[in-house]
Amino acid sequence: ARSIMREVQEGVSAFVEGLRFNIGLGVGDQVALMTFGGARFILVDWTGDLEQLKEGATKLRSRPATGAFLPDAVNDIAKDFAEREAARPVLVVVATDGIDYGSHHDYRRIVQDLRASYTLMYSVFIPTASRRLTLNWDSRERDALLSEGPRQTGGRRINLSGSQPVRDALISIQNELASQYVVTYHRPESPVPPQRLSLGVTRPNLTVRLTPRKPQ
């Protein structure tokens, strides 16, 4: 049988290892590892120590006696980023379709807070056989956040299917993070300032997403 938690552990470990070689954490760059089955729990607090993060990944466990509070956890992270004045905040959420017991926050407001803190959000969704039994209203709110958070911040949602490994999804996210470009431009003088900017690419089958850069 498929062990989802083992896959998540291996995927997060590979993601952390890739931070060393693919992205290269700079001085002051920090990563945290948190779970949200029930109240948010910090496995590894903000750190630049990748070995500590890899060890934390091995401690990821399912918490079957609790319900998920994903919207509240994402809301807390958005506040953390704002308070820390993070220069390049990125949030990667890995979630299954277990029961979500509700939230005190509307997903639309959470997405606004993510955008206000210039957070780039990705989500990896792992379906299970119990999905048809858990589509309550709160789960719909969670699903909306998993979709709209990435869409409105420049990330993307990855829905795993069949035996697709969690590791592959996380590595693909990491490759995108390592392939970002800063676009600068100068607009011509005009009595009416333009409201939109269009960016085109010539390479076929290439998708470009925008994440507004935090003002310096």
Regions of interest found by a model, annotated:
Residues 1-216:
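Scaffold/interface architecture of coatomer-like assemblies
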